[in-house]
């Protein structure tokens, strides 16, 4: 059972609530994180949420997870899902189980968004469920 969950949010997710709400919903990132923190507390696990627009910063945070007691990672790498071998390699290097989450259904989007550099390494993929997808991932992580 995971005791400490790290939730990573990639580029442009800091704009949630105002960025294309028809795709990503009307909740802000702060509201999503607050809901996840509340859920984690109810489940008896720790949760840290972190966001960056910068690929290198995400890689460094993934690497830091190796030393900070993180048992499980939930990641929405956003655009880096489709472009970043560096994020993939960092996740592979730390060998911490992770779930890939996307607010929108990647398979109803442009063809370039339908490829993920992360999915084959992930324990699972949740997409198209909006903020509920993060909650499903937290529930799973808390049990494994």
UniProtKB/Swiss-Prot annotation:
Catalytic-site annotation from UniProt: 24, 102
Q: Which residues bind substrate?
A: 76, 82, 89, 103-104, 113
Family listed: Belongs to the type-II 3-dehydroquinase family.
The answer to keyword Coiled coil applying to this record is: no
Top EC group? lyase
Q: Record's CDD domains?
A: DHQase_II
The record's SUPFAM superfamilies line, in alphabetical order, gives: Type II 3-dehydroquinate dehydratase (SSF52304)
GO terms (BP aspect): amino acid biosynthetic process; aromatic amino acid family biosynthetic process; chorismate biosynthetic process; quinate catabolic process
Q: How does it assemble?
A: Homododecamer.
Give the disulfide map.
Answer: none
Name of the protein this chain belongs to: 3-dehydroquinate dehydratase
Q: What does this protein do?
A: Catalyzes a trans-dehydration via an enolate intermediate.
**Positions marked as site (Transition state stabilizer):** 19
Q: Which reaction does it catalyse?
A: 3-dehydroquinate = 3-dehydroshikimate + H2O
């Amino acid at each position: 059972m995971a005791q400490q969950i790290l939730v990573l949010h990639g580029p442009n997710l800091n704009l949630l609530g105002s960025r294309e709400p028809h795709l990503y919903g009307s909740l802000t990132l702060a509201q999503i994180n607050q809901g996840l923190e509340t859920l984690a507390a109810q489940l008896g696990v720790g949760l840290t949420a972190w966001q960056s627009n910068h690929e290198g910063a995400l890689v460094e945070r993934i690497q830091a997870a190796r030393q900070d007691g993180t048992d499980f990672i939930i990641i929405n790498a956003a655009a880096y899902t489709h472009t970043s071998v560096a994020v993939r390699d960092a996740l592979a290097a730390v060998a911490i189980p992770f779930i890939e989450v996307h607010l929108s259904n990647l398979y109803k989007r442009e063809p370039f968004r339908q490829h993920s550099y992360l999915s084959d390494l992930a324990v699972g993929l949740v997409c198209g469920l909006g903020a509920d997808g993060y909650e499903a991932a937290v529930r799973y992580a808390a049990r494994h």
